[in-house]
Each structure stands twice: as C-alpha cells, then as structure tokens.
Design a protein with these regions (language model features):
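Carbohydrate-recognition loop of C-type lectin domains
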Residues: 185-325
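N-terminal polar alpha-helical/low-complexity "assembly arms" that mediate subunit docking
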Residues: 1-201, 258, 286-372
Length: 372
C-alpha cells in the first residue's frame, strides 16, 4: 500500500502568525519592528514555529500509514514484523567432467561483478551454486562461469543453467507497511490459514502460497507454492519449505506445523494460455509491427494474474473459499485495443474456446502462442 501523506496539522502556525499573536497580547508599548519588544518576541516566535513543525513530523511518524521507513520498522516490530533481508540466489551449476568434485570452489561470471560458491551436490556433475552477492541481481545471469584463482585444473566446463531459488532485495517500505496492516485483519496463530501464509513467506525465495486445509482428510494441509518471482517453485525450493514446515509428516509437530497437522508442499502447475484473435489494422500497420508490444502486454497480464493468485483464497464471514483465476477475453481485447495501429478485434479465443478461461486453483497462467 502507498504511504499516506497527511496535510500539516499546524501549517497555519507560521512565524508571522505566532509573532502577531504575541504582539496582540502586549498593549500600549512600542511594538514596531526593531523595537526591543518586537526583537525579543521575534526570536521566541521562530523557535515556536520550529516546535510546531516538529509536532507535525511527530504526528506523521506516529502512524503506520504515514510513517517513513525508519519509524515504520519500529512500529511494525511491535507486531512482530521484521523487514525481510536481502538473500542470495541459488542456481544449478553443471560441470564437466562429471566425476570432478567442485564443492566449495569459487567461480565468477565474466563481464559482471558476480561471484559464486559451489555448495550441495544434486547429482553427478550438477551442484547447487550460491551467488555470493546479496540481492536480485544474482537472478538475472545464466551461462558459463570461470574458476577464481585456485580452481581445480581438471574442470573443463562450468555453467549456470537454472535459477533454483530466486534472491530477493531488502523488503520495500510499502511491503512492510502492507504486512503491518494485514496483521490486524486476520491473526496468524495455531496453524490457521494466515499462519501458514506467514510462515511460508518467511522462507527465503518463496512467493505466494495457496493453503488448502483438510485436502486429504482431517489434519492434512496442502501448500501450493510460487517462488519470489511468481514462477512455479523449483523442486529444491519445495523440498526446503517441506523440511522447515513438516519434515516428518507424522502429525507430531517436528517442524513449524502445529501438532496434529500433516503438511504436503507442492509447486503450482503451469497452464499455457494460447491466444487466437483476428485484428484489423490501421493503414500502414501490420502484425509484425505490433507483435512485440502485443506480446509484452499479454505477458504483463499473465503476470498480474499470477501476482493475484494467492488473493483468490478468500476468508469471509461465510467461510473459506478458494476461487480460480480467470483469464478474461474482455481484458485481452481492451489491452489490445490500446496498441497503436490496432483498430478492431474479433473472434478472440483462449486455448481454442471463445470464452473466458478458468484456471484450476493449483495452476498459474503462462503466455503460450499468440496467433492472428
């Protein structure tokens, strides 16, 4: 949520107003500028104006909706909310020959300032590799890496091929503010739905989660995850969340899950959304000219839906409801009509059907093919 900037409560208390009020209380004296009475009161009026300005600052910093980052962090701490720190990206590295042990070796990415250290072995020739720099920059680079001085001379090739757990930057001020106010809406406690949402989000690399209670009988809970970048969670991230929340699955509360709960963690599935439509172009335009912008707009729409995925779990006085995401034909058409050169749209279909596309609660939309 955005920071609220209130109007100053004491903005009218200027030097001139304060001084005039002071002068009005003095009668039958020389009160002209430069006189002793005027000079002595003017100094006090300046200080009083500064006090009023400080009072405005105190009011702004006292409330969660208007506080700046420093004071919002202090306010949120009273609710047990601590800003998420920046984290390290974890990637899959593949090395040849496959029998060489590269555990603990350090590498760098050419033409960047990024360095990496090899950690856990996944299989022969494949390892988890941690970017040594904090923050999201480590999410953006794949490709060949080179050993830093002292590398194993047997290494022939080294390559980062997949982002396993995305890094995140230090939590933004507005994200902290949103979590602060969310803490008043539904209390996270005792393994309720909000509790699972909070405990999953506190694990590095995680994004939205959908919580399905009693999905396989009493005491069972299903957690369906996305990663921090709103993509399906990798098997490594799924395993990490499972290990932290319920490593044994025996209802005994060994992890963070309460006693009596058996938690299963899975990644969301992908549903490719193929769009077919008939476009009419303004003279001087054709499909090749507008295709990049159309693709960008449709990718952005799919991302908006993925970002709203967890919000489809609704807890209301009527109960708990898990609603599907719906890809709207009307949304697609309205966005396409905003592209310069497109003047009409007809016969839009989603995955071959001329209707809105409903996506099951355990899946997320990804843009497939666009055809005209």
């Amino acid at each position: 949520m955005a920071q609220y900037i209130p109007d100053p409560q004491f903005g009218s208390e200027t030097f001139e107003v304060i001084l005039q009020r002071m002068m009005d209380r003095i009668q039958q004296r020389d009160k002209r500028e430069g006189a002793v009475i005027w000079d002595s009161n003017a100094s006090s009026a300046i200080e009083l104006q500064l006090i009023y300005l400080a009072l405005d600052d105190i009011l702004i910093e006292s409330f969660g909706d208007s506080a700046s980052r420093e004071f919002l962090i202090r306010r949120a701490a009273e609710r047990g909310i601590i800003p998420f720190p920046a984290t390290h990206a974890i990637l899959r590295g593949e090395f040849t020959p496959v029998d060489v042990d590269v555990t603990g070796r350090r590498f760098s990415m050419p033409n960047t300032a990024l360095t990496y250290i090899v950690e856990d072995k996944i299989e022969d020739g494949a390892y988890q590799v941690r970017c040594e720099q904090l923050g999201s920059e480590g999410n953006h680079f794949l490709g060949s890496i080179v050993p830093i001085l002292g590398g194993n001379p047997r290494i022939q090739t080294a390559e980062l091929v997949e982002l396993l757990i995305p890094a995140q930057d230090v939590e933004s001020t507005e994200s902290i503010r949103q979590r602060y106010f969310d803490s008043f809406n539904v209390r996270a406690m005792g393994g309720n739905i909000r509790d699972y949402q909070v405990m999953v989000r506190e694990i590095e690399g995680t994004g939205p989660v959908r919580v399905t209670p009693i999905w396989n009988g009493g005491g069972t809970v299903l957690l369906t995850l996305l990663d921090y970048l709103y993509n399906p969670a990798s098997p490594v991230l799924v395993d990490r969340v499972q290990e932290i929340i319920d490593p044994t699955g025996d209802h005994k509360g060994v992890g963070r899950a309460p006693i009596g709960h058996q938690v299963t963690v899975q990644s969301a599935n992908i549903l490719d959304v193929n769009i077919s439509t008939e476009l009419t172009f303004l003279g001087g335009f054709n499909w090749e000219m507008v295709q990049p912008q159309v693709t960008s707009l449709m990718e952005a729409y799919m991302m908006e839906l993925r970002q709203d995925w967890q919000n489809q779990d609704i807890l209301s006085p009527l109960g708990f409801f898990q609603n599907p995401l719906i890809v709207m034909v009307s949304q697609i058409n309205s966005r396409l009509l905003g592209v310069q050169g497109i003047i009409d749209i007809q016969n839009t279909t989603l995955n071959g059907v001329a209707a809105n596309l409903e996506i099951d609660i355990y899946s997320i939309p990804m843009l497939g093919a666009i055809s005209t």
